Amino acid sequence: MVSQTVSVAVTGGTGQIAYSFLFSLAHGDVFGLDCGIDLRIYDIPGTERALSGVRMELDDGAFPLLQRVQVTTSLHDAFDGIDAAFLIGSVPRGPGMERRDLLKKNGEIFATQGKALNTTAKRDAKIFVVGNPVNTNCWIAMNHAPRLLRKNFHAMLRLDQNRMHSMLSHRAEVPLSAVSQVVVWGNHSAKQVPDFTQALINDRPIAETIADRDWLENIMVPSVQSRGSAVIEARGKSSAASAARALAEAARSIYQPKEGEWFSSGVCSDHNPYGLPEDLIFGFPCRMLATGEYEVIPRLPWDAFIRGKMQISLDEILQEKASVSL
């Protein structure tokens, strides 16, 4: 039985990530099995036929939670009165394209989306950004939507967290459920910071199970950092199904939190407990409070290895921010 209904927008609705995510969303994986969904699926003009096909499949899925499905090429219609938005659509990096070119193209897209959110979305709407470069895209959208709460903008680092979680599980030869406090800091890029020093295995410090520090620093960390490129090289396309699952999990950690769960998210750095510059979207370990708000987990120690990686990631975020104009 549906106890409430949320209005949700998904952009990039004809893309691979959205295609996987929409069915997970419709099944109740994000908001729960008692929450109805008023769904708006957006993509750019020219995609109308493909959007209609996505709607057909959702209709054919006969999902009880879907109260309404609207497909549109209007951001105003997509974002009108929404409770949550999943900003998936972006320009992918093409052959010969420099990162600065990608930042410029996507900066324009997310500035436009931020302005539309500012005009039409609910003030307390939660915004989950997936399109890369995700930290900077999220920052651009946030700063173009000053009416919305800055704390409710999230850049997805959950896929990085999941990759690290899986690698630690395999190395320790334990179930995924035995591994906890997996943390990824900083930028979602090859300079992200997979922080194994906080992780627990069977509620014990990781070093008691994985004593090989060289493997952690020189195999695991760079493997997580470069996993996206490895997937592209292997399948010829970027991560889609795993990214969609990570997005569903990232949102579920906020809407249906587990007691004591840590999750990594790129959030606004204003008033952060680590003294990092404000007005950034930076990956932090977070947890939900009884109030329904999240907090950045404070007072986690950084050893020399992690501190060095943190500075590299911070410098990259600052460089990206400096390269775009609001």
UniProtKB/Swiss-Prot annotation:
InterPro entries: L-lactate/malate_DH, Lactate/malate_DH_C, Lactate/malate_DH_N, Lactate_DH/Glyco_Ohase_4_C, Malate_DH_type2, NAD(P)-bd_dom_sf. The active site is at H188 (proton acceptor). Keywords: NAD, Oxidoreductase, Tricarboxylic acid cycle. The keyword NAD applies. One of its GO terms (molecular function) is L-malate dehydrogenase (NAD+) activity. Disulfide bonds: none annotated. NAD(+) binds at G12, G13, T14, G15, Q16, I17, A18, N106, Q113, V130, G131, N132. Substrate binds at R93, R99, N132, R163. NCBIfam families: MalateDH-SF1, PRK05442.1. This is Malate dehydrogenase. The lineage of its organism: Bacteria, Pseudomonadati, Chlamydiota, Chlamydiia, Chlamydiales. The gene is mdh.
